[in-house]
Regions:
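Surface-exposed loop/turn motifs in large extracellular/passenger domains
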Residues: 94-104, 118-137, 149-163, 174-191, ...
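Membrane translocator/pore-forming domains, dominated by Gram-negative outer-membrane beta-barrels
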Residues: 512, 619-637, 663-667, 671-938
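Short, T/G/N/S-enriched strand-turn elements that build extracellular solenoid repeat scaffolds
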Residues: 88-90, 100, 112-113, 143-145, ...
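C-terminal low-complexity, acidic/polar tails when present
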Residues: 29, 49-55, 114-115, 564-609, ...
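Extracellular beta-strand/beta-solenoid scaffold signature
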Residues: 84-90, 109-115, 140-147, 166-174, ...
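Outer-membrane translocation/initiation segment of Type V secreted surface proteins
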Residues: 4-5, 14, 18-25, 29-30, ...
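Extracellular beta-solenoid/beta-roll
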Residues: 329-332, 344-350, 355-358, 374-377, ...
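N-terminal segments that cap or nucleate solenoid repeat domains
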Residues: 63-110, 404, 408, 412, ...
């Protein structure tokens, strides 16, 4: 694989050491700053400085100069203080020992700089301290800096106690056999290198960079161990200590490189194009190159190595990255291991209970070379969503320290098959999906946070801790649940298998299902062993409309001893002491099957012989379990029909057959009616029973439209009515109530014949407003709208038996139709009125006794009567739809009625009347009605 370019890195290895050419073996003598110097060529391209004449004063600091001082071989001389502008190149330790110290705010400025230049040259430049005003000691090299330039040279640069150095570039150990050392130490101590591609630590020789105690280096591209045979070492140590290259870092380019990030230090790469632009770290770049990087801390402070692009461990050479206790390595994109076929890459993630190394990356990618990844207590942390987080790793052993995965709020997938006997831990928010067959991993797995989704096989025991989740469609070992287990895939339904025992220790189970019949799709937890403890189960209905079950929907399968309890945690209501969940028209309870010990969601009555107090008669055999709103909705339709029934003529206006003869006598009337009912339908889906208390007020006017002197007349009328009722509903599925307000109008037309014949026709329109409640589920519907209309015709004839006594046979036919507006109840079930029609015939006979009298000059008339009726219903009652499930109700077809009443009239204008009726269906239902009214003519 082609290596990334070094651009200008090679341009600065060697520069002419003086102002004269040394391209041949010729010698030249010249005067440099008062020193006679001969340039003598030992071999082409390499100068040697020979001092021919100089005075000792040339090397001594100026009198009184305390901030810039030099000793030994420092060129050019003399050293100026406190601010020395060299005007050319600076050499400290050309061929002998030399030191230059810049302290207490002093400054030096030069072109190029050589510290430890030629063979035998030992140079030390120390930059330290600040002045009294806080101004740092400063060294500025406009060109490159070579520390340990030629073979046999040894150079040292020390930047201490807040000193600041700046240069174009830097090379430590430029030639084979040279040694270059840089120490940047102390808060505020800085070395800034301006060129993007030129910072070599061990170019051909040995280079060492040490940054500690808060020192910082800002450089271009960093290369540690550039050429073959070179050796580079970089140690960045201590909190606030930092190396921040504006380009890539190469550790072991062609030579040997080592980078240590320790005790809270920071090393970070980013490109110069913009802040945060990508730059990578290469460890073991080319064939023959060997790089080692270790990130760790013993102080508790986190050491950080970060690349704004990739970390490459073994590009074509040999690379090793170790992230140990207290270390954090970050690859903004990916971490590659052993990329080229010639490479060897080793990634060590180490740690223990006292601290763990962390590699934060988008993914770890296995290359074509020799790959070694040691998961030994360190943490792999994701920094993006990634479906193939361990890319290319078909198998992976887990070392003694264990594998630790931190999804860090991301969605991460791993298809690797793990093996080992230690531990596997899921950390952090987010989801880790394991799809490989890790049956060979027999150690303990802990889900400490976030979600572990197992779609493959994970051997060994599993512990789900509080706040964590285990999900998936695969297989795990014996499981302890302190958190949440949610079988199934991300979408759809599926089963998670626990190959072993299950122990509930405060955890819960989440199940998604499509609530319907026995074959409904559902998530399921399969336990091959035994169960212990109590587990709350939260069931989420995914689009299920409800249906009657037989055996039920199996959600927990237990193959072993089923001693554990699974209890529905999110029931919509409680029935018979069991929480129940509503889907459409049905309620579902979670039950253990007495045969197989597994757990099922069932929409069936579990104890049909034990209805709720006050409930209606349940079905003879266990039937469906309807949700608590259904009996109320059934009763709602029946109540509307009962409240829409039409009265008889005599109930409405009393007995007008005895009004004074003659046309022109119009009238007005008002009546109040009250009733109490107990209705036990002959046909009822829910076995509900209703108790209705009703009050109604009706006011009307009559006008004689035609009349004869013989007493026959045609009377037209119009009445308005208003009423309120309270319905109490009882059912094995749950009790409830309905509060109804109604109003309407009734036009009438009545013919009274002179021979005792009458014919009465009436029509009625009513509008309803109802509030529906369930005792188990609370409010079902407020302000439910409904309407009805009805027609009735009644006819009869009075036959005189003797003076004042008459027998009145009569018959009536009424038709009523009711409908309510459809609505969605609190559970989301659609409730619709399907039909609500009644066609009732009544045949009866009344015995009427009348007496006339006069008192105080006022005519008075009174009559009392009794009536006996037989009623028959010809239609089938009401039918509603609850989530497309038909719910029907019909009262008994045949009823008997007994009524008594009285009229009292005076002054030929006024009358009061009343009637009490009792209706019964001979099977327990009854209605008692009382009405009282006042009528006047004018």
């Amino acid at each position: 694989m082609k290596s990334p370019p070094l651009s200008r890195a090679g341009k600065y290895l060697f520069k002419k050491r003086c102002r004269v050419s040394y391209c041949s073996h010729a010698a030249r003598i010249y005067l440099r700053r008062g020193i006679v110097v001969e340039e003598h060529r030992h071999r082409a391209g390499w100068p040697k400085w020979i001092i021919l004449a100089a005075s000792a004063a040339s090397f001594a600091p100026l009198a009184g100069a305390q901030t810039v001082s030099g000793t030994g071989d420092v060129q050019p001389g003399p050293v100026a203080s406190p601010d020395w502008v060299v005007g050319g190149d600076l050499i400290v330790g050309d061929a002998a020992a030399g030191t230059l110290t810049i302290s207490n705010g002093g400054s030096v400025r030069n072109d190029w700089a050589f510290i430890g230049n030629l063979n035998g040259g030992v140079g030390t430049l120390t930059l330290t301290g600040v002045d009294g005003s806080g101004n740092a000691s400063r060294w500025t090299s406009l060109g490159p800096v070579y520390i340990g330039a030629d073979p046999g040279s040894d150079g040292t640069l020390r930047i201490l106690n807040g000193g600041v150095a700046q240069s174009e570039s830097g090379t430590l150990g430029a030639s084979a056999g040279s040694v270059g050392t840089v120490v940047v130490s102390g808060p505020g101590s800085n070395w800034n290198l301006n060129t993007v591609n030129a910072f070599l630590i061990g170019s051909d020789g040995k280079g060492t960079l040490q940054i500690d105690n808060g020192g910082a280096v800002r450089s271009g591209q960093g290369v540690i161990g550039w050429n073959a045979g070179s050796e580079g070492h970089v140690t960045v140590s201590g909190s606030a200590s930092a190396w921040n290259p504006f380009n890539n870092i190469y550790v072991g380019f062609n030579g040997t490189g080592e980078l240590l990030v320790q005790d809270g230090a920071t090393v970070h790469t980013e490109a110069t194009t913009s802040p945060g632009a990508p730059a990578s770290i290469y460890i073991g770049q080319n064939a023959g190159g060997a790089g080692t990087v270790t990130v760790s801390s013993t102080t508790g402070a986190i050491s950080t190595l970060s690349a704004s692009d990739r970390i490459n461990v073994g590009w074509a050479g040999t690379g090793a990255l170790t992230v140990a206790k207290g270390g954090l390595a970050i690859a903004a994109t990916d971490t590659w291991v052993a990329i080229d076929g010639t490479s060897t890459g080793t990634l060590n993630l180490n740690g223990d209970a006292s601290g763990r190394g962390v590699l934060e990356t988008g993914s770890v990618i296995k290359g074509a070379g020799n790959v070694n990844v040691n998961l030994d207590g360190g943490i792999l942390r994701a920094n993006r969503d990634e479906a193939n987080f361990l890319n290319g790793f078909a198998t992976q052993a887990v070392a003694a320290g264990g594998a630790w995965f931190d999804t860090n709020g991301r969605e991460v997938g791993v298809s690797t098959a793990f093996s080992g006997t230690s531990v596997f831990n899921k950390l952090g928010a987010g989801r880790l999906t394991l799809s490989g067959n890790s049956a060979a991993f027999t150690g303990n797995t802990e889900v400490q946070a976030g979600t572990l989704q197992v779609d493959g096989v994970l051997g060994g025991p599993v512990a789900v801790l509080a706040g964590a989740r285990l999900t998936g469609t695969g297989r795990v070992g014996a499981t302890t649940n302190k958190g949440t287990i949610a079988p199934g895939p991300r979408s759809g339904f599926g089963a998670l298998t626990i190959a072993g025992d299950y122990a509930a220790q405060g955890g819960n189970l989440e199940i998604r299902t499509r609530l319907g019949g026995d074959d409904s799709p559902t998530d399921k937890l399969v336990i091959t062993g035994a169960t212990t403890g109590s587990t709350p189960v939260t069931v989420t209905n995914i689009g299920g409309a409800g249906a009657q079950t037989q055996r039920g929907i199996q959600v927990v399968q237990v193959n072993g001893l089923s001693a554990g309890q699974f209890n529905l945690a999110n029931g919509d209501y409680v029935i018979g002491g069991r929480p129940a969940l509503v889907a459409g028209a049905y309620g579902y309870v979670l039950q253990q099957d007495s045969g197989d010990g597994s757990w099922y969601l069932r929409s069936a009555l579990t104890d049909p012989g034990s209805p709720q107090t006050g409930g209606g008669s349940p079905p003879a055999t266990p039937g469906p379990l309807y949700q608590p709103g259904v009996p109320v909705y059934e009763a709602y339709a029946n109540t509307l029909m009962q409240l829409s029934k039409l009265p008889t003529l005599r109930q409405r206006v009393g007995d007008r057959r005895y009004d004074p003869q003659g046309a022109g006598r119009n009238g007005a009337w008002a009546r109040m009616e009250g009733s109490t009912s107990r209705l036990d339908p002959a046909v009822s889906t829910t076995g509900q029973r209703q108790d209705i208390d009703d009050w109604k007020m009706q006011i009307g006017v009559d006008r004689i439209l035609a009349g004869q002197q013989d007493g026959s007349r045609l009377v037209g009328g119009l009445a308005l009515h208003y009423g309120i009722s309270d319905t109490r509903v009882s059912s094995v599925y749950g009790n409830g109530s309905i509060d109804t307000t109604r109003y309407g109008l009734t036009p009438t037309l009545t013919w009274y014949g002179s021979d005792g014949v009458y014919v009465d026709a009436q029509a009625q329109a009513t509008w309803f407003d109802s509030d529906l409640k369930s005792r188990l589920a609370g409010k079902l519907k407020d302000g439910g709208k409904a309407s009805s209309y009805g027609f009735g015709i009644e006819a009869g004839k009075a036959y005189g038996l003797r003076e004042g006594l008459a027998l009145v046979p009569q018959a009536q036919v009424t038709y009523v139709s009711t409908r309510f507006d459809r609505f969605n109840d609190r559970f989301g079930a659609r409730v619709e009125s399907d039909k609500g029609d009644s066609l009732q015939g009544r045949f009866g006979v009344a015995l009427d006794y009348r007496s006339n009298g006069q008192g105080a000059g006022v005519d008075r008339q009174s009559n009392v009567y009794g009536v006996l009726n037989l009623k028959h219903e010809f239609l089938d009652g009401s039918r509603i739809q609850v989530a497309d499930v038909p719910i029907v109700s019909r009262m008994s077809r045949t009823w008997g009625n007994l009524g008594v009443g009285a009229d009292y009239a005076w002054a030929k204008r006024y009358a009061v009347y009343g009637q009490v009726d009792a209706d019964a269906d001979f099977s327990g239902s009854y209605v008692v009605t009382g009405t009282v009214g006042f009528r006047m003519t004018f």
